[in-house]
């Protein structure tokens, strides 16, 4: 509640990301769009696009949307984060983004592996929005709920690959 990090948040977000993807597989869902909400989901885009999941038939056509909030934490995840993450896969280039696991670096990495970004709240760090634009990501700007909902639905329609089987 005070905004400080738990010492094991690195393991928690890894467990969460892997848990979500393994649950999807177990339930035999094949998502067209995976929408990640908030910093705690920041590893999902990496897992879907750069680890063993990228070649998994459940995820190889999935698009990833990341919603950004004004939920920045101070400090960084533990120093051993990158060592633990390397076990999951990726390349030297991928790991560079996670060398210093601050909020900004985690979210920039998440943006780089996402197909689109939604600014879901006022007060989102402008550096993240600028990073998304510079990396040619489709960005849905913050708007009142109904307006933004319509834009997100249109985004889903534009990204989704419908399997007719």
Where do the language-model regions lie?
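Catalytic cores of nucleotide-sugar-dependent glycosyltransferases that transfer UDP/GDP/TDP-activated
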Residues: 1-165
């Amino acid at each position: 509640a005070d905004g400080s990090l738990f010492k094991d948040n690195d393991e928690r977000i890894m467990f969460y990301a892997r848990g979500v993807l393994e649950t999807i597989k177990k339930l035999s869902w094949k998502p067209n769009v995976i929408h990640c909400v908030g910093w705690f989901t920041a590893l999902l885009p990496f897992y879907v696009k750069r680890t063993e999941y990228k070649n998994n038939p459940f995820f190889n056509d999935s698009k990833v949307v990341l919603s950004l909030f004004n939920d920045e934490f101070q400090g960084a995840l533990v120093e051993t984060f990158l060592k633990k993450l390397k076990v999951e896969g990726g390349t030297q280039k991928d790991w560079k983004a996670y060398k210093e696991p601050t909020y900004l670096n985690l979210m920039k990495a998440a943006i780089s592996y996402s197909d689109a970004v939604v600014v879901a709240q006022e007060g989102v760090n402008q550096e993240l929005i600028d990073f998304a634009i510079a990396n040619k990501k489709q960005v849905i700007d913050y708007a009142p709920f109904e307006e933004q909902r319509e834009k997100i639905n249109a985004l889903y329609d534009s990204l989704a690959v419908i399997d007719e089987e």
